[in-house]
Amino acid sequence: MRGFLLSAALAALFPGTVQGAGPEGIVDKLDSAVVSTSRAGESTPVTYSMVSREQLQSVGPSNSLPMALSLQPSVMAVNEGGTGLGYSKMTVRGVKGSQINVTLNGITLNDAESQEVFWVNIPALSSLLSSVQVQRGLGTSASGPGAFGASINMSTASVRPEAYASVDVGYGSYDTFTLTAAAGTGKSRHGLYFDFACSKGVTDGYIRNAYADVASAYAALGWMNDRNSLRLTWLYGDQHTGITWNGIDLHQYEADRRYNPAGEYYDAFGNVRYYDNETDNYTQHHLQLNYTRLFGERLLWTTTLHWTYGDGYYENYRPAGISGYYGFDQDFSGDFIIREALLNNYLVLNSDVRYRTDALTLTAGVTLSGYDGDHIGKVQWSDFLGDDYDYASHEWYLNTGIKKESNAFIRAEYEPFRWMTAYADLQYRGVWLDMAGPEDDNVPLDYSTDWQFFNPRAGLSFRWSGSHKAFMSAAVGHREPGRADIKENIKNAWLSGHQDVSLKPERMLDLEFGYAFTGEKVSASANFYLMEYWDMLLETGKLSNVGYAIKENVDRGWRRGVELCASYEPFKWLRADANLTFSLNKIRDYKEYVQNVDTYENWTMTGRTTIYEYGNSTMLMSPSVMGMMRLTFVPWKKSAVSIDGKYVGRQYLDNTMTLSRSIPSYFVSNLSVSHTFDLNKGTLGLALYVNNIFNNMYYADGWCWKNIIEEDGALVDGIGIYPQAPVNYMLKASYRF
């Protein structure tokens, strides 16, 4: 039991080998075939780690999936509201969310336009999953936007043999409450099964207006026998959160680190007020129908039809006028309330086939997808137009986007000798994008283009003496700009009078070399990576008006580093795990283009820019050092105590290595204590989670802006940061049978 508790608490933190955390041993089962075609296996020369269902369920109940994965090697996670519930995001090796390919049961969850995954839209996802594989580097071929530094491969496909039920209730700081319930029939003798789960989470959040009211539901109805599997899966997410994406500046941070300017305005008497519906709201449905067929013992075919429907909006108060509003008869000024909505449909057909012999595994697949999204703007109220104006009949703007993709790959793993595996993976991606109509500042966003990509991968892995493994691999990847990248580039070109509005797709060569040793009490691994970029789409440090990072092409850059992992288990009741990453994240001959404004008083863009040259510069939000250590004790049967610490080095908020525009290094520690009681029927678990136990006052993410004032040539800048909560607590009670 002690060994099981140690594994459940720690395997999520440390990949047992460089290639993976150990064999899953289920790739031939029908209930896992739907995801195995895009996952790396034990001998695949890809850097990855595995996280099981038990490990995911052992994290704090308020943590989103990025926060649950934050102790993985080279992973950094942050929450906008300062806690684990609500808007969260993560990076891997400094690679941002829009460059991380995320799949659920082999189907991409990345939004087709922004390429992001908005984890808040699927709350409590970790409680619904049977396993997660985190690949670092270009990884294996997968559907959807190509991985450009990391992949997160998630699975709900795990059929339990017997009926089950569970309830988890959590309560903690900032009036945070979570409830998760799950039940399933298990597989009947006729092969039928049904699983259902639902969750609810509410919190006031740490900073003002960081409240969250989120819910999710999951259902799977299926049938399987020895040769066939048919499964219908539904995943639902609903979120209502306060807007927090602006962060706060340093002066505000020093005065009140819980301050949030969102929705702030002055009334007629000069008093500070806050709009009470400064919110972000979104509902999403995912529906998957999968059929899998096993022909003989060697050939397997799986096909999935997937549909995502999303509908939501954000609403906020803008205490300043703006002109040129599309859909209105006249310009107007003064305070106003806007609502910007998104309505989208995403349809995917994915089909894979796998053939396996004793020495050869051959996998091929095709994915076809289409996305149709409408971006709709409405003015809810304006003090210029008054309360009696017919706002419903006047649409502010309508912008449409259609994106189609075709994706085909073939992958082979061949073992010419028992101690060696050769790997090759060839992928084609074709992408077609059409945008039409203006957005909130009346800039026309009519744009149409297509991209064709070829992404080859190859590698070798070696095994000897039963405890040593090594691998080497090379891969080429391409990735197209996202909608937000194109939109902001068009706007900047429009405002500055430039003609070229195109952004180039980025290209990467990823070289990986790894070694791992696994002993009875000690395990250790080292992985070296060289991620070489051309035409890299890199953040400038600025954010759009809705919190998207604005990017630009840079000719040449690289991320080069070493990832070290180790574990030591001197006794059955004690284990230590650690990982450490050292990296260089550089841009060659970086040039910064700063937009000029006329005067301090007018602050009107002149269409001119000032150029600064920095030589080889460090990429923003890419710490050169990060690491983790965790100790786990099992003092007596069915009890566990663990303490962990995460260190993240200094991060710059832009690409200029300016100390005043940077996030200082920080260290944060967490403690958990748990015990499980056996009952007449089922088990009762109690757990206490103490986050940030040393009460460190730190911030983990941010952005910056800058302009040149032409009247005196001065550079004026500012930053926005996201304070994280001081010491906070969560209690969880779990009942399972």
Name each region found by the language model.
Residues P66-T108, S130:
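Extracytoplasmic beta-strand/coil segments of soluble accessory domains associated
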Residues T108-R136, S155:
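Short acidic/polar hinge/loop motifs at secondary-structure boundaries
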Residues L235, E413, M472, R575, ...:
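Conserved C-terminal beta-signal and adjacent last beta-strands/turns
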Residues N281-D440, S461-S465, F517-T518, V522-L530, ...:
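Face-selective signature of the C-terminal outer-membrane beta-barrel domain
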Residues L294, L300-H306, R463, K469-A475, ...:
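Membrane-embedded beta-barrel scaffold of Gram-negative outer-membrane proteins
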Residues R418, L530-E532, E552-N655, S734-R736:
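Gram-negative outer-membrane beta-barrel transporters
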